[in-house]
Structure formats: structure tokens, C-alpha cells
Amino acid sequence: MNLKGKNVLVTGIASNRSISFAIAKILKDNDANVVISYQNDRLKERVLKLADELEIGNAYQCDLSIDHDIATLRDNIKEDCGNLDGIVHSAAFAPKDHLSGKYLDNISRDGFALAHDISSYSFTALAKAFKNDLNEAASLVTLSYIGSNKVVQNYNVMGVAK
């Protein structure tokens, strides 16, 4: 697979065990120009170390629950790399207390909304923001998990969100 000259945004890298980390590595191994995002300063140092490990030069802060952050991400990528050839959406989040115990005992309206905003809607928000900055035949991919269609203990609200 030759991806030389292709610009691909990968979201959701949290550790070297993340599916998104493996995807970014495969993209890099096939000569893609990979750009990544991280949520906030708390994750910055960890994600930048992973970017260095993969020899990724472009890493941008972007809270996917904030439209202005997504617009800034788009503008920064456009300025530094040009249009995108792909987006890999691997971002997911739910409040920790929503991922244990019985689903109905721990779920709240705010936690449910937050899990869906980050884990699901943010893919649409990225697509909307980048719609005019994608090269022809660009691909947008979002990831799911077996817990979205089978019962997985403690996956709870994430099963519905993904």
C-alpha cells in the first residue's frame, strides 16, 4: 500500500496500546503524512512522546466537544499540511463512574450526553468541519468495538455510544 503524499488525521491516540496508535503506525509505515490530535494539556506530554515514537511532526490540541477547537484544528492542518486524504476517528470517552456496575444504576443524562458527544457525534463534527478541505476520494473512518453489538461487562453507556 503506497500512501506517499497522503495526509491523514488520526484522533484518539492515548497510549501505545491504542488501536489508533497501531493505525497511525501502519499509515506511517506506508509513507502517509500522519497528523494527530490530543484533547488537552493533561494528555499533551504523553501524546507528544507517542508522536515522537512514530516520527509524527504534527500534533494539535483539540477538544472534540468544542466546535471552535475543531475549526482551529482544521485551520492549523490546512496551513501546515494542506487538504486531508483521510480522517480516522478513534476518540471515545465516558465518565469513569458510567463504566462500572449496573448500567441503570450509574447512568445520568449528562454522562450519557457526554459519552455520545465525544464517542459518536465528534465524528460528524469533524466531517462537517473538514468537508471543504478533503481531497477527492478522501476516506473518513470511525471505529467501534464489539461492545456496541454484544454485551460486554461494564462497557455500559459506551456500547450505546459506539
Per-region residue spans from a language model:
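Canonical Rossmann dinucleotide-binding motif of NAD(H)/NADP(H)-dependent dehydrogenases/reductases
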Residues: 3-36
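Conserved hydrophobic beta-strands of the Rossmann-like cofactor-binding core
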Residues: 7-11, 87-92
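Catalytic loop of short-chain dehydrogenase/reductase
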Residues: 12-21, 92-132, 136-162
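Residues at the C-terminal ends
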Residues: 28-29, 79, 135
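Helix N-cap at the beta1-alpha1 junction of Rossmann-like dinucleotide-binding domains, i.e.
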Residues: 40-43
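Rossmann-fold cofactor-recognition segment
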Residues: 51-68
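Local beta-strand N-terminus motif with an aromatic residue
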Residues: 56, 83-84, 112, 137
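Conserved Rossmann-fold cofactor-binding substructure of NAD(P)-dependent oxidoreductases
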Residues: 65-80
